[in-house]
């Protein structure tokens, strides 16, 4: 049966010997035996030359990056390129599927969630333990543990090792895309968060906004105080040799509006020989835009690069201006819809639990980051389940003057804390929303607006759009001391 009661789940590990033989006196009834073990994911890194190919390391334990770094980049940083000759390290696309276990998983889960994992393992394999709601809460704790290990033990440790050699670190998106995890938090360790965009633009697959959305990476950079947002730029499966600079400029403009400030061309290939027929050799046979010195439009590259350089220079000056801070919720595990309908004339950034709890405060009625980026409102969009600590932080922000838009959650998002967590949850929900189901609930210096759409709430608060325009104009607003400027394109 798919449903099973927690008190019916027995741990019979002690009945199995070292050779894997089970010697168990089976009680009355019908039993299903789950034999649980773990193996290497079986993935190798790629694409890579034969000499640089090997097994993927453990991403949920520091032993993985320790061995990987010492055996690869560390050999250069502490060898032929020591003394500052190597100044950076880039971790490219994930491309190694996912990992769900490490030897210390049970200890790590208890440390993170506060209760033992083993009896709940059937839920990982698709069983409903007790009921749907209880199982959903456990699975959130499970995914949060994996996400935290993924961020701290791999990316955090890899950056720590790189910094010991004076290397700046940039890496691309993976959390929330391949691995279910908080897609902002793991960027907090990056010196330069990185995303990617493809050409040509399209409504589906690789050229669409939602294939590899820019907004999560740009938001992570802003939330964690990183001024530069790099992008693997102009990647393509269509090696048709008919791309041109005007088309590439449009692709760049669209993604710059979403927050990209630094371009890493995909690809520029080394073409030292002069006896090849033009335009020369590309990267493989079918990926990337061929930036080559024998391209027909290469003579115009100086002007094109000057345009890109000027734009990206300005896009890193000052601070971004957005009205709405969109809280992605305590159940965040996948990438959001970048095409989600949003009020015209307003801009937003995403916010995650870690930033909400540890990096946000209120100043002059605005929600602010330590770097001074300001937001007029914080939006809770469809947050069905929440954590008590999240609600308590929201309450503290509202009392200091923050404006929160959104309805009360329907339930608790975790099994951690049990009755204590439920009491904290109930108290915070009552303090924030009280008996108000629609309208404004004033608390201290701030308020909670509920029972209406974001459009209606912004109107209720008498907030005017930053930009009023017709047609297909795209824009971005930045501000520095004494000046505002807008990047506008169509």
Residue ranges and their predicted role:
Residues 1-86:
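Mature N-terminal, pre-catalytic/accessory segment of carbohydrate-active enzymes
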């Amino acid at each position: 049966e798919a449903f099973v009661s927690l008190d019916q789940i027995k741990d019979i590990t002690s009945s199995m010997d070292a050779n894997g033989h089970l010697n168990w006196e089976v009680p009355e009834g019908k039993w299903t035996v789950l034999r649980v073990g773990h193996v290497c994911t079986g993935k190798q890194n790629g694409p890579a030359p034969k000499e640089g190919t090997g097994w993927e390391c453990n991403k949920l334990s520091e032993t993985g990056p320790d061995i990987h770094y010492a055996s690869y980049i560390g050999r250069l940083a502490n060898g032929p390129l020591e003394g500052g000759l190597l100044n950076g390290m880039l971790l490219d696309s994930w491309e190694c599927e996912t990992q769900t276990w490490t030897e210390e998983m049970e200890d790590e889960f208890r440390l993170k969630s506060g209760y033992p994992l083993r009896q709940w393992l059937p839920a990982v394999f698709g069983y409903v333990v007790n009921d749907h709601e209880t199982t959903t809460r456990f699975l959130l704790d499970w995914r949060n543990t994996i996400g935290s290990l993924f961020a701290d033990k791999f990316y955090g440790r890899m950056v720590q090792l790189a910094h010991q050699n004076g290397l700046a670190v940039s890496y691309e998106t993976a959390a929330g895309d391949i691995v279910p995890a908080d897609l902002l938090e793991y960027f907090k360790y990056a010196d330069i968060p990185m995303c990617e965009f493809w050409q040509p633009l399209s409504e589906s697959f690789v050229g669409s906004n939602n294939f590899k959305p820019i907004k999560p990476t740009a938001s992570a950079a802003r939330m964690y105080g990183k001024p530069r947002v790099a992008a693997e730029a102009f990647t393509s499966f269509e090696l048709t040799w008919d791309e041109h600079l005007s088309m590439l400029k449009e692709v760049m403009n669209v993604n710059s509006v979403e927050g990209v400030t630094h371009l890493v061309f995909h690809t520029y290939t080394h073409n030292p020989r002069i006896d090849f027929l033009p335009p020369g050799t590309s990267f493989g046979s079918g990926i990337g835009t061929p930036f080559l010195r024998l391209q027909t439009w290469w003579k115009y590259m100086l002007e094109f690069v000057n345009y890109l350089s000027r734009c990206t220079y300005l896009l890193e000056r000052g601070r971004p201006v957005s009205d709405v801070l969109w809280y992605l919720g305590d159940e965040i595990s996948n990438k959001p819809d970048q095409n989600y309908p949003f009020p015209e004339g307003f801009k937003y950034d995403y916010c995650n639990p870690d930033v909400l709890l540890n990096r946000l405060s209120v100043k002059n009625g605005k929600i602010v980051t330590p770097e001074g980026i300001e937001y007029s409102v914080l939006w809770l969009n469809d947050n069905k389940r929440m954590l008590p600590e999240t609600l308590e932080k929201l309450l503290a922000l509202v009392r200091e003057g923050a404006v929160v838009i959104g309805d009360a959650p329907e339930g608790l998002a975790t099994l951690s804390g049990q009755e204590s967590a439920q009491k904290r949850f109930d108290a915070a929900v009552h303090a924030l929303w009280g008996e108000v189901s629609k309208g404004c609930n004033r608390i201290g210096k701030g308020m909670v607006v509920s029972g209406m759409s974001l459009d209606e709430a912004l109107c209720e608060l008498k907030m005017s759009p930053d930009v009023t325009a017709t047609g297909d104009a795209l824009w971005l607003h930045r501000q520095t001391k004494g000046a505002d400027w807008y990047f506008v394109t169509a």
